[in-house]
Curated annotation (Swiss-Prot):
Domain Radical SAM core: residue ranges: 99-333
Organism: Shouchella clausii (strain KSM-K16) (Alkalihalobacillus clausii)
GO-annotated cellular components: cytoplasm
Entry binding sites for [4Fe-4S] cluster: C113, C117, C120
Lineage: Bacteria, Bacillati, Bacillota, Bacilli, Bacillales
Catalytic activity, reaction form: adenosine(2503) in 23S rRNA + 2 reduced [2Fe-2S]-[ferredoxin] + 2 S-adenosyl-L-methionine = 8-methyladenosine(2503) in 23S rRNA + 5'-deoxyadenosine + L-methionine + 2 oxidized [2Fe-2S]-[ferredoxin] + S-adenosyl-L-homocysteine
Entry's cofactor comment: Binds 1 [4Fe-4S] cluster. The cluster is coordinated with 3 cysteines and an exchangeable S-adenosyl-L-methionine.
GO biological process, alphabetically ordered: response to antibiotic; rRNA base methylation; tRNA methylation
Protein name according to UniProt: Ribosomal RNA large subunit methyltransferase Cfr
InterPro entries from the UniProt entry: Aldolase_TIM (IPR013785), Methyltransferase_A (IPR040072), RlmN_N (IPR048641), rRNA_lsu_MeTfrase_Cfr (IPR022881), rRNA_lsu_MTrfase_RlmN/Cfr (IPR004383), rSAM (IPR007197)
Matches recorded under SUPFAM superfamilies: Radical SAM enzymes
Classification via CDD domains: Radical_SAM
Cofactor(s) recorded in Swiss-Prot or TrEMBL: [4Fe-4S] cluster
């Protein structure tokens, strides 16, 4: 018996159990097995009758997971896992472990990306497919079932999160008290500036963290680096972000990848400061400066800015009393750092 195609497997589970006339507490038994006892295999959910376990296996497969691990790579503080998803495609997810014991996860929303940012490995692949809500949340569930603590989550892996509307189903799963039960404030969604879905984040998930990938304060240059700027111009995005702050009271993070000789000058820093100070809530913008991480598929003409330029840029922003940090580097040696995820695909010719 095949069930209707609800947005997530948890909805499909409810429908399936109802169709079998199972008591309503069966769903809770399954979710407790997964999220309380970390059991991912249906045949090991021994609180369920054997016949029901067999029915679940026949309908959903042996595991609750919809992703399949292919390769795991580890460095000192980082684990990167390559996962197979529907259509025989692949995505990557990253776990970062901090010395204080905190664990943070970076997950993908798309297989590849169709927006073509010129300095990004994922963008060099092109868009293979949008991930389902289950494929997004199962990247986390994979780590959780292995015993890891989901202290914070960011949609900063492969893909543009807000270009995949299924992310909103995924976010609902992550905050569902019967499922992952994550605090919205532990979740960060990154975007290049998809205005309609930023507005949807404002109304539907006001307490979640929002990061805007800016990378140049100049319209023409940003359009060259990030073609999406032609559809959603920087001026308009900044207005929408200001409205987001007004309605939520939450700060917005500005991600800025430092590209040597491209966007790392004092002129760029001063223009970035001017853009932020022109908004109603300049103290609620937090700039994250990110060292560029070249890898497979990224053009050779981009390089990492020199440390002196990075520090000068930092001082210009900080002197304007705008919160600013230089993001710590994790996982560069295993292609797990910012902008390096490419799912072992070959880059398209640009």
């Amino acid at each position: 018996m095949k069930v209707v195609n609800h947005a997530t497997k948890y909805e499909r589970l409810k429908h399936f159990l109802n169709a079998l006339n199972e008591p309503t507490y069966r769903y809770k038994q399954i979710t407790e097995a997964i999220f309380k006892h970390r059991i991912g295999a249906f045949n090991k959910m021994t609180t369920l009758p054997k016949a029901l376990r067999e029915s679940l296996i026949n309908e959903f497969g042996p595991s609750i997971l919809t992703v399949e691990p292919v390769l795991e790579t580890t460095s000192q503080q980082v684990t990167k896992v390559l996962l197979k998803v529907a259509g025989n495609n692949q995505v990557e997810a990253v776990r970062m472990h901090y010395e204080a014991g905190w664990e943070s996860f970076c997950i993908s929303s798309q297989c590849g990306c169709g927006l073509g940012c010129t300095f990004c490995s994922t963008g060099a692949i092109g868009l293979k497919q949008n991930l389902s809500a289950d494929e997004m949340t199962d990247q986390l569930l994979y780590f959780y079932l292995k015993g890891h603590s989901l202290d914070s989550v960011s949609f900063m892996g492969m893909g543009e999160a807000l270009a995949n509307v299924r992310i909103f189903d995924a976010l609902n799963v992550l905050v569902d008290r019967q499922l992952f039960a994550l605090s919205p404030r532990r979740i960060t969604v990154s975007t290049v500036g998809i205005i309609p879905n930023i507005q949807r984040m404002t109304s539907s998930f006001p307490q979640m963290n929002l990061t805007f990938s800016l990378h140049s304060p100049f319209h023409d240059q940003r359009s060259e680096l990030m073609p999406i700027n032609n559809k959603y111009p920087l001026d308009q995005v900044m207005n929408v972000l200001d409205q987001h702050i007004h309605e939520t009271g939450r700060k917005v993070y500005i991600a800025y990848v430092m590209l040597r000789g491209v966007n790392d000058s004092e002129k760029h820093a001063e223009a970035l400061v001017k853009r932020i100070l022109n908004n109603r809530y300049p103290h609620l913008y937090h700039v994250n400066l990110i060292r560029y991480n070249p890898t497979v598929g990224t053009p050779e003409n981009y390089g990492q800015t020199i440390e002196e330029k990075l520090q000068t840029f930092y001082r210009v922003v900080k002197s304007a009393r705008i919160p600013v940090t230089i993001r710590s580097q994790f996982g560069r040696e295993i292609d797990a750092a910012c902008g390096q995820l490419y799912g072992q695909y070959q880059a398209k010719k640009r």
